[in-house]
Amino acid sequence: MTIAFQSSVFALIAISTLLVIGVPVALASPNGWSSNKNVLFSGVSLWIGSVFLVGILNSFIS
């Protein structure tokens, strides 16, 4: 179970890093919000799912 928890924490950190870099770059592009909103919504949805997954797995570890 700890391997799954550690993997999900690593995935959360990786997704967070990608969003921190990707969101400003996507919004600064010439088309900005209109062309990148689906990608941004997908990334944010994946991040929220990862946060809940880490929380659920943490309840089994602690």
From Swiss-Prot:
PSII is composed of 1 copy each of membrane proteins PsbA, PsbB, PsbC, PsbD, PsbE, PsbF, PsbH, PsbI, PsbJ, PsbK, PsbL, PsbM, PsbT, PsbY, PsbZ, Psb30/Ycf12, at least 3 peripheral proteins of the oxygen-evolving complex and a large number of cofactors. It forms dimeric complexes. NCBIfam families: PS_II_psbZ. GO terms for cellular component: chloroplast thylakoid membrane; photosystem II reaction center. Belongs to the PsbZ family. Pfam families: Ycf9. It is a multi-pass membrane protein. It comes from the Eukaryota. This is Photosystem II reaction center protein Z. The lineage of its organism: Eukaryota, Viridiplantae, Streptophyta, Embryophyta, Tracheophyta. Keywords: Chloroplast, Membrane, Photosynthesis, Photosystem II, Plastid, Reaction center, Thylakoid, Transmembrane, Transmembrane helix. HAMAP family: PSII_PsbZ. May control the interaction of photosystem II (PSII) cores with the light-harvesting antenna, regulates electron flow through the 2 photosystem reaction centers. PSII is a light-driven water plastoquinone oxidoreductase, using light energy to abstract electrons from H(2)O, generating a proton gradient subsequently used for ATP formation. The chain crosses the membrane at residues 8-28, 41-61.
